[in-house]
């Protein structure tokens, strides 16, 4: 089979305790747009980047929400032209553990990044686009 024209996309499905509330929060805080909504399960996108919401199913131990287990093992990265404005918007909508944007020296140059935790326990990092702009440059190896 010739896969030369095949493409692959990667997305995340966020398990949340309250699906419909999560959809409204991501709309208000991130400017997410709804692709489809089945009630408790929804497809959204931010600036064309899709992600999905699924309300936690009681008893389904393989897919608990962060609020059920008291932690998350994933950090979601958002790259934008104005990281501070997005973090401020999330904070105004009820985000917690807000970290203001600060400068970080990286192999690809200065990277401005901050973050927050959404009301459903997911950790978000929000930064400028420097990591995306400089991906073509080889990084120094070990």
Question: Where are the language model's segments positioned?
Answer:
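Conserved ATPase active-site switch/coordination loops adjacent to the nucleotide-binding site
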Residues: 120
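Vicinal oxygen chelate
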Residues: 1-13, 23-117, 127-142
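Short, surface-exposed ligand-recognition loops at beta-strand->loop->(often short) alpha-helix junctions
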Residues: 14-18
């Amino acid at each position: 089979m010739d896969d030369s024209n095949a493409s692959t996309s990667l997305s995340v499905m966020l398990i949340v305790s309250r699906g419909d509330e999560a959809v409204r929060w991501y709309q208000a805080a991130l400017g997410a747009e709804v692709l489809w909504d089945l009630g408790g399960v929804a497809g959204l996108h931010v600036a064309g980047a899709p992600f999905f919401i699924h309300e936690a199913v009681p008893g389904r131990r393989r897919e608990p929400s962060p609020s059920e287990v008291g932690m998350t093992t994933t950090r979601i990265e958002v790259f934008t032209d104005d990281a501070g404005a997005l973090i401020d918007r999330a904070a105004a909508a009820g985000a917690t553990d807000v970290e203001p944007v600060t400068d970080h020296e990286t192999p690809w140059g200065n990277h401005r990044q901050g973050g927050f935790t959404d009301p459903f326990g997911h950790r978000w990092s929000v930064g400028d686009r420097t990591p995306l702009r400089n991906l073509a440059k080889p990084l120094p190896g070990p």
